[in-house]
């Protein structure tokens, strides 16, 4: 079986969020299952020179973008057994950031078209094209409407994964004819029209053979008005083609036994060495090196989605507890300013790093006792799984993948691997933090919690098997349709 991942970012080459981690880890795991999984992404300016040196040009062609004819180079690189194809066009991709440009609609209209145009040139004919988020949303739609009649494409199936339904790729109506070579009949409710705009995300939801989300709970949530971002009706209509498959983490990269970024590596059998990382973390943030004071951490995008309004609401009440707090992240200016001010207001209790720093993030996962994720919504979330892998106990709101991966500790049955609260309410969060702190002060309970956390399986193995089954059923379904018509 052959599968092509069409993505807008992929670790370790280009990353702005969790999508890159998925695109970097899942194809590797699928290859271990015997699937020829390859990845296609733009060749961004920001890709490190050491990767660019390893690329070799395998094709050149012209890609139509409306009436324009744009150059397309294809460069190939092999890494960890996976073949990556980079779509090269300096006009579109020689930019300082991956996204956020005035012409993102044109950039990704070009990329979606290039994905399909390139395949015959590189002589790769996938059984399944697996697209991710709005940036590649037009691939399934263009395949269905403009390419499916050609012999080369006739048997190709499409899977579309929703990583975050909030970002939909909305553009003016004129993009249809001008950039996508689609006429006005496609600007209807049952095609691409979405409240007066063209929606790339909707194109994928309408045309893909299978739709997946990144956790079972998020799959259910997005079929409701509260989480559905005005697409819940369409998703309910396609519920028979909708799957929720939990993301995993790259357990080779996030491995406390061999992590090069840690002060001290450790395993489930040498958990006492975790304390060395805690002291190093306290030292790094200028906090007193107290072993018996619980250290809570957040590694987060500083946005309202991540529940930071809850934290700002009860911050001073949190600070009345005997605890320390470390925060790493960047995002909305108001949150950056708030946490910077709190670090100054509570010296010795609060440490803040504005920005993202991979080695420091690993040190935080290893050095903290508790990890706070109070998200408004969270399609999957990787942070809670990374924290669990490092024996750092998560405090989460019960939404999306957080609900699927963190089971709240039950003092009667002694089951659970973290702490959780249901309502998006600051004092519910505060109560849960206080509950977690009370169990931190019970060493026998805490030992059980950290051991259970570290023994959990958060890898891609289970998820990769589910994707393999989904691909196989899709191909089988198509063969059945062809035979029985």
UniProtKB/Swiss-Prot annotation:
It catalyses: [(1->4)-alpha-D-glucosyl](n) + ADP-alpha-D-glucose = [(1->4)-alpha-D-glucosyl](n+1) + ADP + H(+). Keywords: Glycogen biosynthesis, Glycosyltransferase, Transferase. One of its GO terms (molecular function) is alpha-1,4-glucan glucosyltransferase (ADP-glucose donor) activity. SUPFAM superfamilies: UDP-Glycosyltransferase/glycogen phosphorylase. It is an enzyme of class 2 (transferase). Its EC number is 2.4.1.21. It holds the Pfam family Glycos_transf_1. Pathway: Glycan biosynthesis; glycogen biosynthesis. One of its GO terms (biological process) is glycogen biosynthetic process. InterPro entries: Glyco_trans_1, GS/SS, Starch_synth_cat_dom. ADP-alpha-D-glucose binds at residue 15. It comes from the Bacteria. Disulfide bonds: none annotated. PANTHER family: ALPHA AMYLASE DOMAIN-CONTAINING PROTEIN, GRANULE-BOUND STARCH SYNTHASE 1, CHLOROPLASTIC/AMYLOPLASTIC. Synthesizes alpha-1,4-glucan chains using ADP-glucose. Belongs to the glycosyltransferase 1 family. Bacterial/plant glycogen synthase subfamily. This is Glycogen synthase. It comes from Geobacillus stearothermophilus.
């Amino acid at each position: 079986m052959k599968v092509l991942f069409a993505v807008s970012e992929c670790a370790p080459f280009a990353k702005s969020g969790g999508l890159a981690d998925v695109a970097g880890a899942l194809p590797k795991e699928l290859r271990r299952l015997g699937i020829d999984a390859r990845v296609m992404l733009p060749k961004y300016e920001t890709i490190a020179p050491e990767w660019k040196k390893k690329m070799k040009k395998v094709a050149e062609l012209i890609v139509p973008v409306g009436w324009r004819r744009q150059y397309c180079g294809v460069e190939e690189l092999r890494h960890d057994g996976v073949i990556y194809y980079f779509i090269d066009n300096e006009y579109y991709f020689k930019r300082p950031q991956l996204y956020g440009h005035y012409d993102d609609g044109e950039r990704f209209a070009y990329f979606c078209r290039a994905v399909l145009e390139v395949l015959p040139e590189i002589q790769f004919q996938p059984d399944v094209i697996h697209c991710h988020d709005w940036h590649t949303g037009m691939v399934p739609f263009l395949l269905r409407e403009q390419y499916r009649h050609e012999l080369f494409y006739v048997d190709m199936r499409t899977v579309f994964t929703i990583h975050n339904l909030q970002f939909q790729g909305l553009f003016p109506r004129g993009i249809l004819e001008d950039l996508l070579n689609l006429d006005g009949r496609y600007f209807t409710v049952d095609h691409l029209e979405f409240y007066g705009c063209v929606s790339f995300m909707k194109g994928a939801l309408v045309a893909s053979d299978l739709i997946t989300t990144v956790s079972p709970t998020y799959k259910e949530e997005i079929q409701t008005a509260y989480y559905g971002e005005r697409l819940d009706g369409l998703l309910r209509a396609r519920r028979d083609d909708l799957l929720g498959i939990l993301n995993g983490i790259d357990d080779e990269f996030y491995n406390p036994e061999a992590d090069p970024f840690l002060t001290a590596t450790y395993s489930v059998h040498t958990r006492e060495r975790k304390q060395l990382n805690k002291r190093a973390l306290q030292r790094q943030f200028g906090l007193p090196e107290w072993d018996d004071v619980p250290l809570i951490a957040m590694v987060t995008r500083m946005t309202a989605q991540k529940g930071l309004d809850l934290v700002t609401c009860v911050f001073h009440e949190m600070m009345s507890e005997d605890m320390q707090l470390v925060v790493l992240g960047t995002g909305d200016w108001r949150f950056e300013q708030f946490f910077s001010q709190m670090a100054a207001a509570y010296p010795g209790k609060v440490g803040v790093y504005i920005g993202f720093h991979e080695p420091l993030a690993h040190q935080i996962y290893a050095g903290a006792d508790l990890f706070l994720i109070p998200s408004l919504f969270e399609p999957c979330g990787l942070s809670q799984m990374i924290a669990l892998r490092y024996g750092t106990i998560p405090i989460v709101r019960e939404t999306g993948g957080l609900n699927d991966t963190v089971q709240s500790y039950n003092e009667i049955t002694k089951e659970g691997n973290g702490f959780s609260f249901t309502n998006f309410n600051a004092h519910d969060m505060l109560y849960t933090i206080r509950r977690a702190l009370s169990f931190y002060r019970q060493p026998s309970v805490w030992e059980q919690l950290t051991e259970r956390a570290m023994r959990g399986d958060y890898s891609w193995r289970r998820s990769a098997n589910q994707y393999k089954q989904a691909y196989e059923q899709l191909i089988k379904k198509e063969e059945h349709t062809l035979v029985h018509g």
